[in-house]
Amino acid sequence: MKKLNGKLKHNIAVFLSGRGSNLKSIIKYSLRKEKFYKVKVVISNKQKVKGLSIAKKNNIQSYCIDFTQSKRLGNKVLNILKKNNIKLICLAGFMKILPAYFIKSYKGKIINIHPSLLPKYKGLNTHKRVIMNNEKFTGCTIHYVNRFLDSGKIIIQRKVKITKKDTSKSIEKKVLKIEHSIYPKTIDKILSIL
């Protein structure tokens, strides 16, 4: 934990599998003096993704370890997190399911952002399914991670209106915009009470 302006900053880890757009907004928000966290570690299950480049550009430790199918590699990741005093794991476009033993090690301290208004549209291809079902609204959900897919306790949701002109791409852009706004603030709020 780092002390800044008399406040303690909690170390967080961000897990991702791709472009890292949420990572970028989380880092930017965390750099404000009065915020409660610092991105200390980034873990990706894929090599050569933009998210790892964003981490390196911001001098954040980053690792490419596809650990979800190997307990040995999972323990390696847990050791990295422990060594860096990680208080919260934030999944941001992490496209793997965490093993039960891993979730148990950080019980109540892993959150995820999902691009739908859960419990509707768990899993992949949410925007296409929203259009197919003629939904009037969609949005994003931040929730605690448990052993079931996109089923943990909901922390916060934000919705956006769907118009007749919307496509899955335009909906993705709308939802991503609100994700970038609420995810960093929600992380800060959770850590402010730890």
Could you describe each region identified by the protein language model?
Residues 1-194:
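One-carbon transfer enzymes
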